[in-house]
Amino acid sequence: MVGSAKIKVGINGFGRIGRLVARVALERDDIELVAINDPFITPEYMTYMFKYDSTHGQWKKTEVTLHSEGHLTFGGNPVAVYACRDPSEIPWGKHGADFVVESTGVFTDKDKAAAHLKGGAKKVVISAPSKDAPMFVMGVNENKYSDEDIVSNASCTTNCLAPLAKVINDKFGILEGLMTTVHATTATQKTVDGPSSKDWRGGRSAATNIIPSATGAAKAVGKVLPELNGKLTGMAFRVPTTDVSVVDLTVRLEKPASYDAIKTAIKEASEGQMKGILGYTEDDVVSTDFITDSRSSIFDAKAGIALSDTFVKLVAWYDNEWGYSNRVVDLIVHMAKQGTSQ
């Protein structure tokens, strides 16, 4: 992590986010993917799943070749492959992995994620909310990072909501707010009705239902923006689309503002300090227009409405897979830069 050397990254869990983080990493000049661990898929199947993606299309940027049971190459660059169930057994140190992306959805607290450090990793980024690891949202609170070894990149929905909420709160003040995310189907849902003892509705067929669901994304904004702690909460509707979700944020403002003034504030932020994180559009867009959009949150100026100058509904789109995966990599790069500057 010194000078212009590439940041060496390993991935634990080669599911939706793991595979897309790999794609993002392979597209960047400052990242080197060195190892992948997944105990549930063979290297042959791993190669196939990486190459072919029903949502984001076929990978054509580099050749992906299986050389042996424990060895893949991406465009000539070797990547070690493991199938360890215990993260402490993955030899990250052998491959110089400075950072590990923990994307299994299983090892989401600090104690469990710390197992990667035993294998030689220096830092761990959890690609999910965590009950005890510090959470960072790029564009919002990454400047609070202080060389912690284990961090969380929060959730895709928090990454959409927090930049929007920060702009509105900084400019006008938020007294209170309710968020709804209309969220695309994810891997935890069932294709047809099936058992889901903790969430009965969540066990119903994803392909044929709009499913109300709980989400901690709005409350989590209070962890990355303490000034909004206790002021936001929300829920989700899971809908039968494969990717791209949309946040509907309804807030009471502290300072009166016209909808045009709100639009201007968001547009300025999208072109300034939050460029690449927060987007702005006045086009007549729909969800598929944002597939493989790398931004965290794209404000839809035409979709929002104001009841009064202190009560407004704001709408922002996000590719819950690709945008989030980009932020995982951005957080790694930010952490590496902070490490070299200390």
Curated annotation (Swiss-Prot):
Its main location: cytoplasm. Keywords: Cytoplasm, Glycolysis, NAD, Oxidoreductase. Its EC number is 1.2.1.12. Pfam families: Gp_dh_C (PF02800), Gp_dh_N (PF00044). PANTHER family: GLYCERALDEHYDE 3-PHOSPHATE DEHYDROGENASE, GLYCERALDEHYDE-3-PHOSPHATE DEHYDROGENASE GAPC1, CYTOSOLIC-RELATED. Belongs to the glyceraldehyde-3-phosphate dehydrogenase family. This is Glyceraldehyde-3-phosphate dehydrogenase, cytosolic. It comes from Physcomitrium patens.
